[in-house]
């Protein structure tokens, strides 16, 4: 019965999304791509996939940045098509997905402005899914309070910004604190919204968002070593909707080095496994790569269940990983640096 009700409003879009997912590159496609000698070869191989002629109008010689832009453009068109045909509560769910891109755009613009880069040069670098009308006014803000009052007060990010408002000048450290505070509030709000929807959507999305929250807490901790950020301030940046909450986060807040972070992870089976295989030696996978691999697994598993919104989130994340893979391979081909060309993260 629940499936019938779900299908009234969201069944067509879920089916469409699953159709899009069938076009994600397989391992056999990657084996062809890594054998390419030039970007023109790569373009030719991509024509035999669901990407088709997306590079057909691009003049030679192709650049990696052009490939990156066209990959993003194709993904944005697909996502916006889903958003334009959605109704509540799916439309709000899809809007929530775009808020993370809005946060990234704001941080990019503030950082660029801090380094005296013209706003006209920064706007094209912003992600289209996170664009909003007030973006071009961001250069007038010198403090977080001004940023809120001049730019963010009328955007969906306003509720997330409440804990960031201060009269301190915007510098590198404050910008990072703002980024992480916004993400904390965003993840917690998205998690609560998914729980409110309930059912399979809550089961799938809360698992994915809990991992995202824990990943951010671990990375914030590791990146804070050797900086001026105090342990108390660091603890305030941890999202509280992950599996590490509360004991794991309390232990992370006390950590003084990487080994202590690893010791915290050992109490959580899925995170312990990620640290076990990670390293910075030649041939080792980085912790970041291990996190990406785990994220891919969670998002692939989202498609094993039906009648839920998680497939929309997971499709976007899997396609983003695919775009990173293609850009990585393109960079290696363009620079004739084939030693690390296999360091992409396979999806299927």
Curated annotation (Swiss-Prot):
GO terms for cellular component: proton-transporting V-type ATPase, V0 domain. InterPro entries: ATPase_csu/dsu_sf, ATPase_V0-cplx_csu/dsu, ATPase_V0-cplx_dsu, V-type_ATPase_csu/dsu, V-type_ATPase_csu/dsu_dom_3. Pfam families: vATP-synt_AC39. SUPFAM superfamilies: V-type ATP synthase subunit C (SSF103486). One of its GO terms (molecular function) is proton-transporting ATPase activity, rotational mechanism. The keyword Nucleotidyltransferase does not apply. Keywords: Hydrogen ion transport, Ion transport, Transport. The keyword 4Fe-4S does not apply. Belongs to the V-ATPase V0D/AC39 subunit family. V-ATPase is a heteromultimeric enzyme made up of two complexes: the ATP-hydrolytic V1 complex and the proton translocation V0 complex. The V1 complex consists of three catalytic AB heterodimers that form a heterohexamer, three peripheral stalks each consisting of EG heterodimers, one central rotor including subunits D and F, and the regulatory subunits C and H. The proton translocation complex V0 consists of the proton transport subunit a, a ring of proteolipid subunits c9c'', rotary subunit d, subunits e and f, and the accessory subunits VhaAC45 and ATP6AP2. Subunit of the V0 complex of vacuolar(H+)-ATPase (V-ATPase), a multisubunit enzyme composed of a peripheral complex (V1) that hydrolyzes ATP and a membrane integral complex (V0) that translocates protons. V-ATPase is responsible for acidifying a variety of intracellular compartments in eukaryotic cells, thus providing most of the energy required for transport processes in the vacuolar system. May play a role in coupling of proton transport and ATP hydrolysis. This is V-type proton ATPase subunit d. It comes from Manduca sexta (Tobacco hawkmoth).
């Amino acid at each position: 019965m629940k499936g019938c009700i779900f299908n009234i409003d969201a069944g067509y879009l879920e089916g469409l999304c699953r159709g899009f997912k069938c076009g994600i590159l397989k391992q056999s496609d990657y084996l062809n791509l890594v054998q390419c000698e030039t970007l023109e070869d790569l373009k030719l191989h991509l024509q035999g996939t669901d990407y088709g002629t997306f590079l057909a109008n691009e003049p030679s010689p192709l650049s990696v940045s052009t490939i990156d832009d066209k990959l993003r453009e194709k993904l944005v068109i697909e996502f916006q098509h889903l958003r334009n045909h959605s109704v509540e509560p799916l439309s709000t769910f899809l809007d929530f997905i775009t808020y993370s891109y809005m946060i990234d755009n704001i941080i990019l613009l503030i950082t660029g402005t801090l380094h005296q880069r013209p706003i006209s040069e920064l706007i094209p670098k912003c992600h289209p899914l996170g664009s909003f009308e007030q973006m071009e006014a961001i250069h007038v803000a010198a403090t977080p309070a001004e940023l809120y009052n001049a730019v963010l007060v009328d955007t969906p990010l306003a509720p997330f910004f409440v804990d960031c408002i201060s009269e301190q000048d915007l510098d590198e450290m404050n910008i990072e604190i703002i980024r992480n505070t916004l993400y904390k509030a965003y993840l917690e709000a998205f998690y609560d919204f998914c729980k409110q929807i309930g059912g399979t959507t809550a089961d799938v999305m809360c698992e994915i968002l809990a991992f995202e929250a824990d990943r951010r807490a671990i990375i914030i901790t590791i990146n804070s070593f050797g900086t001026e950020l105090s342990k108390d301030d660091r603890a305030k940046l941890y999202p509280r909707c992950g599996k590490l909450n509360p004991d794991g986060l309390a232990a992370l807040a006390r950590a003084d080095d990487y080994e202590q972070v690893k010791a915290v992870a050992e109490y959580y089976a899925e995170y312990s496994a990620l640290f076990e295989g990670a390293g910075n030696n030649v041939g080792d996978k980085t912790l970041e790569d291990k996190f990406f691999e785990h994220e891919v697994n969670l998002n692939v598993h989202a498609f094993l269940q039906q009648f839920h919104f998680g497939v929309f989130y997971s499709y976007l994340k899997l396609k983003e990983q695919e775009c990173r893979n293609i850009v990585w391979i393109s960079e290696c081909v363009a620079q004739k640096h084939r030693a690390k060309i296999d360091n992409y993260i396979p999806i299927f």
